[in-house]
Amino acid sequence: LKPQNTTAKIAVQIALIVLSVMFFLPLLWMITTSLKPIGETMTTPPRWIPSQILWSNYPKAIFYDSKELGYVPFFVYAVNTVVLTGLVVAGTVFSNSLVGYAFARLKFPGRDLFFAITLATMMIPFPVMMVPTFALFKWLGWVGTFRPLWVPSFFGSAFSIFLLRQFYRTIPFELSEAAKLDGCGEFRIFLEIVVPLARPALTVAALFAFMGTWNDFMGPLIYLMDQRTFTLSLGLAAYQSQHGGTLWNVLMAATCLVILPVVLVFFFAQKVFIQGIATSGIK
């Protein structure tokens, strides 16, 4: 290797290491704070290693009794989040796989125009849609229920449609033609040929839906009124005292428990995730 190439590679690696440490520091601070006594959470200068490791903060987070809101039903929030996330993931995979297939492999009048309009919806900021969407769901009588949070997933999302459409286009059309010669219809071709080959892209769409729903705060904040219907991200607000005295170590322990499923899912599915992202833009 030439000296300048070696120097450039070393510089890039050092920059990547520094950025990785910078991104990891907040997570490390959250983990260490979740194990600290309450007196060490706000010390100056900050104390990274707790003098005493308190694993008891995690049971306290699960069975927390808030001064303002009373007992915090962590398990109820967890069940609500799991149910809601499951519905959104199912709706996302079901609807977007069908729409993406139509845009990628079927020919019909106005296909490219409709696809362009679908992509254009990604340019609309969420705050612009927030008020009219809330008015629509209020007119339907859905405010205060989970339906505004999961029903839209069954009508497709522009990003997942684009992702799946791009992946479908990488699958050889000769496979579909051969299946048609054997008497297969479009739906059977979709189920038995395209879907098995598109598992990496479908997994990516499911992962994005999972992470987006699990971490969603604004949606539940707008539509959920009863504390018994709160999700985990919204329920974390109950750990904060409005009059001072927030137990930050308990709050950080609860936050660690909330993000743990997302970290585990991404850790075990990262190979498929990267494969789906990398192969969706080949063609």
For every predicted segment, state its role:
Residues 4, 8-283:
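A structural signal for multi-pass alpha-helical bundles of membrane permease subunits
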